[in-house]
């Protein structure tokens, strides 16, 4: 599926796992917390480039590929808008994000720098229940879909109140607990259980 892939809008969901909300000292939301990354943030390569003077943290997430135009009317129709599932990293400049939050400002600059939307472009048609991230062969994050506060359908329906979807839109659906900083030379492996992983190197 990766050969002819053209991404459009990139939507992201914050605090969709209670454990992650708690580890950052945030309240658990009562509706999906949506933010965006720019299209230029997409990184489907095998390398992650991080600035040497910044603390960039990984956030492992299931990524949805939207395959239909328009807006669904109900949960069943919402599911039909998903044409593929993959795994990705929402890279975050945590120090900048914290400063922006203190000032009551949007997170945009801390979330949408070049290469901050890392995606395995090999989308699959069924989503496994469990997913994971290792850094230097040590488990950093493990997630299970049953622990999501808002389901894929919840997220799509919530977004459709504001936007009409385009074919090629991407949704990062939230990260489980265990986020942490990346350093140059780190060897990363991310994937779904019992599926071929995506391997990356931090440079």
Task: Annotate each predicted stretch with a short phrase.
Residues 175:
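Switch II (G3) loop of P-loop NTPases
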Residues 1-170, 178-203:
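Catalytic-core "active-site belt" of small-molecule-metabolizing enzymes
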């Amino acid at each position: 599926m990766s050969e002819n892939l053209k991404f459009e809008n990139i939507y992201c969901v914050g605090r969709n796992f209670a454990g992650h909300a708690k580890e950052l000292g945030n309240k658990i939301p009562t509706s999906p917390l949506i933010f965006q990354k720019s299209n230029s943030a997409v990184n489907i390569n095998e390398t992650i480039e991080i600035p040497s003077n910044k603390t960039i943290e990984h956030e492992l997430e299931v990524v949805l590929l939207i395959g239909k135009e328009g807006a669904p009317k109900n949960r069943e129709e919402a599911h039909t808008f998903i044409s593929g599932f993959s795994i990705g990293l929402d890279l975050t400049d945590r120090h900048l994000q914290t400063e922006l939050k203190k000032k009551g400002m949007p997170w945009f600059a801390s979330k949408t720098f070049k290469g901050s939307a890392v995606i395995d472009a090999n989308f699959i048609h069924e989503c496994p229940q469990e997913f994971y991230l290792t850094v230097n062969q040590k488990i950093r994050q493990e997630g299970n879909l049953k622990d999501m506060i808002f389901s894929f359908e919840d997220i799509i329906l919530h977004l459709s109140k504001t936007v009409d979807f385009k074919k090629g839109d991407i949704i990062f659906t939230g990260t489980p607990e265990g986020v942490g900083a990346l350093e140059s030379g780190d060897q990363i492996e991310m994937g779904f259980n019992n599926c071929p992983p995506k391997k990356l190197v931090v440079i």
